[in-house]
């Protein structure tokens, strides 16, 4: 059975970098998928779905639920690794519920933990506006992305706390410290 770890955090929290490094350090057993990267890759293909994704992401809005869930489940099931890290999901209560429903309806994947990389809004803003990855990284869009992240956060945290799978990690430290703590935590579940 595959072990799933969801890594959430504000734009600029470092969640993608953290997950990439953990997967790289444990390449035999851990696969990492960034929801953002999966959606950007689809968008770059300029397919009908890709253009639809681009329409939403260029405005800092959420991509429709069915496209996101389909993309994530496809990535999990096609992976040959036993531990799967997915960052940037869930970003809404609806995404959380849709994934929970799908996970409950099968026995190939078990959700082990939801890890939130916590950073202040100022840190997130400095990191995002400093990296300028694309057209979606300007200040107005940052504030929209921050709102989209914060609006459902309390409900998402409570849902996973009630399931006893929520863990918060301080994202204001060095990458080495964050990755070290997160990796140790993930590996503590065994195989």
Curated annotation (Swiss-Prot):
<keyword id="KW-0808">Transferase</keyword>
<keyword id="KW-0547">Nucleotide-binding</keyword>
<comment type="function">
    <text>Catalyzes the reversible transfer of the terminal phosphate group between ATP and AMP. Plays an important role in cellular energy homeostasis and in adenine nucleotide metabolism.</text>
</comment>
<keyword id="KW-0067">ATP-binding</keyword>
<feature type="binding site">
    <location>
        <begin position="88"/>
        <end position="91"/>
    </location>
    <ligand>
        <name>AMP</name>
    </ligand>
</feature>
<feature type="region of interest" description="NMP">
    <location>
        <begin position="34"/>
        <end position="63"/>
    </location>
</feature>
<dbReference type="Pfam" id="PF00406">
    <property type="entry name" value="ADK"/>
</dbReference>
<feature type="binding site">
    <location>
        <position position="95"/>
    </location>
    <ligand>
        <name>AMP</name>
    </ligand>
</feature>
<feature type="region of interest" description="LID">
    <location>
        <begin position="130"/>
        <end position="136"/>
    </location>
</feature>
<protein>
    <recommendedName>
        <fullName>Adenylate kinase</fullName>
        <ecNumber>2.7.4.3</ecNumber>
    </recommendedName>
</protein>
<feature type="binding site">
    <location>
        <position position="35"/>
    </location>
    <ligand>
        <name>AMP</name>
    </ligand>
</feature>
<feature type="binding site">
    <location>
        <position position="133"/>
    </location>
    <ligand>
        <name>AMP</name>
    </ligand>
</feature>
<dbReference type="GO" id="GO:0004017">
    <property type="term" value="F:adenylate kinase activity"/>
</dbReference>
<keyword id="KW-0963">Cytoplasm</keyword>
<feature type="binding site">
    <location>
        <position position="145"/>
    </location>
    <ligand>
        <name>AMP</name>
    </ligand>
</feature>
<keyword id="KW-0418">Kinase</keyword>
<dbReference type="GO" id="GO:0009123">
    <property type="term" value="P:nucleoside monophosphate metabolic process"/>
</dbReference>
<dbReference type="GO" id="GO:0009132">
    <property type="term" value="P:nucleoside diphosphate metabolic process"/>
</dbReference>
<feature type="binding site">
    <location>
        <position position="173"/>
    </location>
    <ligand>
        <name>ATP</name>
    </ligand>
</feature>
<keyword id="KW-0545">Nucleotide biosynthesis</keyword>
<dbReference type="GO" id="GO:0005829">
    <property type="term" value="C:cytosol"/>
</dbReference>
<dbReference type="GO" id="GO:0005524">
    <property type="term" value="F:ATP binding"/>
</dbReference>
<feature type="binding site">
    <location>
        <begin position="61"/>
        <end position="63"/>
    </location>
    <ligand>
        <name>AMP</name>
    </ligand>
</feature>
<dbReference type="InterPro" id="IPR027417">
    <property type="entry name" value="P-loop_NTPase"/>
</dbReference>
<dbReference type="GO" id="GO:0005737">
    <property type="term" value="C:cytoplasm"/>
</dbReference>
<dbReference type="InterPro" id="IPR000850">
    <property type="entry name" value="Adenylat/UMP-CMP_kin"/>
</dbReference>
<dbReference type="InterPro" id="IPR033690">
    <property type="entry name" value="Adenylat_kinase_CS"/>
</dbReference>
<dbReference type="GO" id="GO:0004550">
    <property type="term" value="F:nucleoside diphosphate kinase activity"/>
</dbReference>
<feature type="binding site">
    <location>
        <begin position="12"/>
        <end position="17"/>
    </location>
    <ligand>
        <name>ATP</name>
    </ligand>
</feature>
<comment type="pathway">
    <text>Purine metabolism; AMP biosynthesis via salvage pathway; AMP from ADP: step 1/1.</text>
</comment>
<comment type="subunit">
    <text>Monomer.</text>
</comment>
<feature type="binding site">
    <location>
        <position position="40"/>
    </location>
    <ligand>
        <name>AMP</name>
    </ligand>
</feature>
<feature type="binding site">
    <location>
        <position position="131"/>
    </location>
    <ligand>
        <name>ATP</name>
    </ligand>
</feature>
<comment type="similarity">
    <text>Belongs to the adenylate kinase family.</text>
</comment>
<dbReference type="GO" id="GO:0044209">
    <property type="term" value="P:AMP salvage"/>
</dbReference>
């Amino acid at each position: 059975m595959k072990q799933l770890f969801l890594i959430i955090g504000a734009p600029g929290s470092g969640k993608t970098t953290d997950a990439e490094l953990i997967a790289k350090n444990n390449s035999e057993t851990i696969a990492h998928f960034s929801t953002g990267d999966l959606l950007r890759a689809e968008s770059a293909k300029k397919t009908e779905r890709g253009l639809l994704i681009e329409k939403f992401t260029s405005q800092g809005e959420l991509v429709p639920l069915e496209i996101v869930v389909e993309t994530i489940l496809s990535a999990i099931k096609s992976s040959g690794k036993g531990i799967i890290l997915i960052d940037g999901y869930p970003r809404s209560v609806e995404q959380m519920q849709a994934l929970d429903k799908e996970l409950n309806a099968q026995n190939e994947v078990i959700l082990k933990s939801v890890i939130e990389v916590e950073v202040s809004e100022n840190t997130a803003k400095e990191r995002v506006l400093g990296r300028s990855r694309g057209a979606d990284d300007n200040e107005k869009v940052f504030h929209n992305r921050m709102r989209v992240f914060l609006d459902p956060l309390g409900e998402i945290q409570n849902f996973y706390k009630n399931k006893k799978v929520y863990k918060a990690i301080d994202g204001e430290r060095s990458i080495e410290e964050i990755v070290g703590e997160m990796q140790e935590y993930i590996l503590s579940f065994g195989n």
